[in-house]
């Protein structure tokens, strides 16, 4: 007898450390040796799953490459990834009806934006007597368990979050590799395949009406999706981590940011689950223990050596019971700041990289061309849009980043935007640590190599002027081949003026909130060191306008 099971991929686009896959390979019978399993691995393009509601060309391409990599692996095993287009509940109902499915397995999507879909699927399974198995593997800990352990309320500070997960204990280690020896792969009958729009080959972004809109800019860094590439990249990243540990520091991509690349970030692979976050976490921690065991200098370990992963967990936990987490007015943890309405072309100029500030513009053009930005550059551009410059809502920036970033993740992306704009996770309406794009540009890119890569119109400007080209005389601008205001825009705001104005506005709002007693349950950093690490503030010069 053969048992038909479905493995439904949403995130978690991998075979390694995939407890849902292991569950789908089980027949659930007492005598499993007499029961063969027929596996149907599927993905459904429903316009929502894997963040496809708001998606640009680069991220859709990365997703499709990740699915193609999965498909290649399944084909090597004698099967294939079945990719459908349609409503998830409708597709699953028809598969249940026609294929005699006994079990549906999938990885938990913990964010509230997926709750309606998953509740409907769970109800369908109950109605049709299909066993539904959901596993936690996209996060290190189950966010619901974290909240329950904290007294059924989300931890309002990062330190409170650390305290809570320390009570729970270390995250689980990765599960073992799947055994496909006795597994048969299922096929979908032709009529049903046609009805459910089963893709005969892996689609391209253009098949979804998503076309490249990088304005013919050159993508200098190529990102390729898929588990195979992610595991290769992990090896390179671990070498970087080991070097840092041997030199006595950690978080190398944050401690010594390299904005010119090649980038060693794993964020896109983690976002789509091409790489297991548990594997990454434990590889780094085991490596740290190994280095320390052979070193005469002992450094404290703990969660901070994978701090960026822990912040990811924190943002997931803060969002899991908050369906309005990605907006301002209905969000209970977000301060309602009276941002300007984008009535002129300010927002468009920021999006297109035409602000007149070279570091901002280079970063925004890199985002359009490649779909990725270093964490530091995200902070600079986000601060400029909100409290550090244009005074426009973080919600506008969030929607732009969600569309174009390869690693755009609703919980993490929204959390970062709220922090940078001082709307949440920051000290109450504090603009004292407000990154200046010019001062930080000089520190990050002293020769202007990054700016010149993405702003070729400034290629002939010397380091003296490349971050402030308007300070060159007109004769010099002509000599450099780019007159400011003609081939490259003049600064759209006076930073000295807007920084003081914004800081004054923040201070006034803070007084009103405190005096009026209307402060919301405001998430905040535990200490100044968290702020300095997040914004990469090594000295006060980087905060001056």
From Swiss-Prot:
Domain of life: Eukaryota
Compartment(s) where it occurs, according to its Swiss-Prot or TrEMBL record: Cytoplasm; Cytoplasm, Perinuclear region; Nucleus
Upper lineage: Eukaryota, Metazoa, Ecdysozoa, Arthropoda, Hexapoda
InterPro entries reported for this sequence: Crypto/Photolyase_FAD-like_sf, Crypto/Photolyase_N_sf, Cryptochr/Photolyase_FAD-bd, Cryptochrome/DNA_photolyase_1, DNA_photolyase_1_CS_C, DNA_photolyase_N, Rossmann-like_a/b/a_fold
Gene Ontology CC terms, in alphabetical order: cytoplasm; nucleus; perinuclear region of cytoplasm
Annotated protein name in UniProt: Cryptochrome-1
Function comment: Blue light-dependent regulator that is the input of the circadian feedback loop. Has no photolyase activity for cyclobutane pyrimidine dimers or 6-4 photoproducts. Regulation of expression by light suggests a role in photoreception for locomotor activity rhythms. Functions, together with per, as a transcriptional repressor required for the oscillation of peripheral circadian clocks and for the correct specification of clock cells. Genes directly activated by the transcription factors Clock (Clk) and cycle (cyc) are repressed by cry.
Record keywords, A-Z: Biological rhythms, Chromophore, Cytoplasm, FAD, Flavoprotein, Nucleotide-binding, Nucleus, Photoreceptor protein, Receptor, Repressor, Sensory transduction, Transcription, Transcription regulation
Cofactor note: Binds 1 FAD per subunit.
Similarity annotation: Belongs to the DNA photolyase class-1 family.
Molecular function per GO: blue light photoreceptor activity; DNA binding; FAD binding; flavin adenine dinucleotide binding
Assembly and interaction partners: Interacts with tim and per; promoted by light conditions.
Pfam families: DNA_photolyase, FAD_binding_7
Domain Photolyase/cryptochrome alpha/beta: 3-140
Cofactor: FAD
Name of the gene: Cry1
């Amino acid at each position: 007898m053969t048992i038909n099971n479905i493995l439904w991929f949403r995130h978690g686009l991998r075979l390694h450390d995939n407890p849902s896959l292991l569950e789908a390979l089980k027949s659930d019978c007492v005598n499993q040796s007499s029961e063969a399993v027929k596996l149907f691995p599927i993905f459904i393009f429903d316009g929502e799953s894997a963040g496809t509601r708001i998606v640009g060309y680069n991220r859709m391409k990365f997703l499709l490459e990740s699915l193609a990599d999965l498909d290649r692996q399944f084909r090597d095993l004698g099967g294939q990834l079945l990719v459908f287009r349609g409503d998830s509940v409708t597709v699953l109902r028809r598969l249940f009806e026609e294929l005699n499915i006994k079990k549906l397995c999938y990885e938990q999507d913990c964010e509230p934006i997926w709750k309606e879909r998953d509740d409907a699927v769970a109800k369908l399974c109950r109605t049709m007597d299909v066993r539904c198995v959901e596993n936690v593997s996209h996060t290190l800990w189950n966010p619901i368990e974290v909240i329950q352990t904290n007294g059924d309320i989300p931890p309002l500070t990062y330190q409170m979050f650390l305290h809570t997960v320390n009570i729970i204990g270390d995250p689980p280690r990765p599960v073992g590799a799947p055994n496909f020896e006795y597994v048969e792969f299922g096929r979908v009958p032709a009529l049903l395949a046609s009805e459910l729009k089963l893709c005969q080959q892996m689609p391209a972004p253009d098949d979804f009406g998503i076309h490249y809109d990088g304005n013919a800019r050159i993508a200098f860094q190529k990102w390729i999706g898929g588990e195979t590439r992610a595991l290769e990249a992990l090896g390179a990243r671990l070498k970087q981590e080991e070097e840092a540990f041997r030199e006595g520091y950690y978080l190398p991509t944050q401690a010594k940011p390299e904005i010119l690349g090649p980038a060693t970030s794993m964020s896109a692979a983690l976002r789509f689950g091409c790489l297991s976050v548990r594997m990454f976490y434990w590889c780094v921690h085991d490596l740290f223990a190994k280095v320390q065991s052979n070193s005469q200098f002992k450094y404290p370990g703990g969660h901070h050596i994978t701090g960026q992963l822990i912040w990811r967990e924190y943002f997931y936990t803060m969002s899991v019971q908050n369906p309005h987490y990605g907006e301002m007015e209905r969000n209970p943890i977000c301060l309602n700041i009276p941002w300007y309405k984008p009535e002129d072309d300010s927002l468009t100029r920021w999006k297109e990289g035409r602000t007149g500030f070279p570091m901002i513009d280079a970063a925004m053009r890199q985002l359009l061309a490649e779909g990725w930005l270093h964490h530091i550059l995200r902070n600079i551009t986000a601060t400029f849009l909100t409290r550090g410059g244009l005074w426009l809502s973080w919600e506008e920036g969030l929607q732009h980043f969600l569309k174009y970033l390869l690693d755009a993740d609703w919980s993490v992306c929204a959390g970062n935007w709220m922090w940078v704009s001082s709307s949440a996770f920051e000290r109450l309406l504090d603009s004292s640590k407000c990154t200046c794009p010019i001062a930080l540009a000089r520190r990050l890119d002293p020769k202007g190599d990054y700016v010149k890569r993405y702003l070729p119109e400034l290629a002939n400007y010397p380091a003296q002027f490349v971050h402030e080209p308007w300070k060159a005389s007109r004769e010099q601008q002509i000599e450099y081949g780019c007159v400011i205001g003609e081939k490259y825009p003049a600064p759209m705001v006076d930073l000295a003026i807007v920084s003081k104005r914004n800081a004054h506005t923040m201070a006034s709002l803070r007084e009103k909130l405190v005096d009026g007693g209307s402060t919301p349950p405001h998430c905040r950093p535990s200490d100044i060191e968290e702020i300095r690490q997040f914004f990469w503030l090594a000295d006060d010069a980087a905060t001056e306008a």
